Amino acid sequence: MFKKWLQPSNEELIKAIYVKNEAEAQKLIAKMDILELSKIYIDNTALIWAVDKGLEKVCEMLIPKMSEQAINHVTNNGNTALTLAASKGLEKICELLIPKMSPQAINHVTDNGNTALTWAAWKDLEKICEMLIPKMSPQAINQVTNNGNTALILAAWKGLEKICKILIPKMFEQAINQVTNKGCTALTLAADKDLKKIYELLINKMSIDAINHTLTSSHKEVKKFIQEKISYNNILAEKLALFLKESFLGKGKDNINNFVKMISAAKFYKIVNKKLLTEYLQKQEVDNSKFIIEEMNNFIKTHSFTIARIC
């Protein structure tokens, strides 16, 4: 009981943090218990105040001594200690916080539409992005900020090739085609950073409209590459569409009498991408295009092992 009376108050600690008296703050923390350290003062915890002031050593002392509820506290401004640390580029603090954040807090969206992931991408915190992505929900990964950015767009903007590769398979159709408030797409930004592997991956995933948007704002060399890639994919789509029409629509399902050809078609299908083929069939106004796609998917599922070995 006397120990509680003698220990410093949370308010004293926050005052030391506010004036950036790091040495004094550390002395106070050493004398305080979890209940006092976890209190809220003017809507913030001592941890959030310390993150805001960039006092990393103070944060390191606070994190293991605070309650789970206090660590996951959301301020009236819509920040958590993690989103704030990411926005300030405090990599070490983010690294300490991530394992302690609840699923709700790790996916938290701030008032300006950011997540810890979008901030980490913007601040070039590649390691933090890698830690966050497996822990986040699909919705949070695909979050669009108030500026029209996604984590993928920001990663491309910053030239984070590894993060782009991780994110691309996880993006929803709308998010991968997202255009920012400044008129950029992940593809235009990847092109600007000369991330050839990334914009090649994106071309196979993005809609024709989004690609055309990129063509109006990209460098000459990038335009040439994209146009060649689209042309190549269209040739593949055309050949595959013709073969599938003959196979699935010629005489019904029984017309599939050449298994090797179908395996080859599956290989083309994997290269061309389901979405691109669908768009091609619709553009060409092919009858029963939905049926063709469904039958191709069924064939791949049925013979996935053989396709994997041959393709």
UniProtKB/Swiss-Prot annotation:
Pfam families: Ank_2. ANK repeats lie at residues 42-71, 77-106, 112-141, 147-176, 182-213. Transmembrane segments: none annotated. Keywords: ANK repeat, Repeat. InterPro entries: Ankyrin_rpt (IPR002110), Ankyrin_rpt-contain_sf (IPR036770). GO terms for cellular component: cytoplasm. PROSITE patterns: ANK_REP_REGION. PANTHER family: ANKYRIN REPEAT AND PROTEIN KINASE DOMAIN-CONTAINING PROTEIN, ANKYRIN REPEAT-CONTAINING PROTEIN-RELATED. This is Putative ankyrin repeat protein RF_0923.
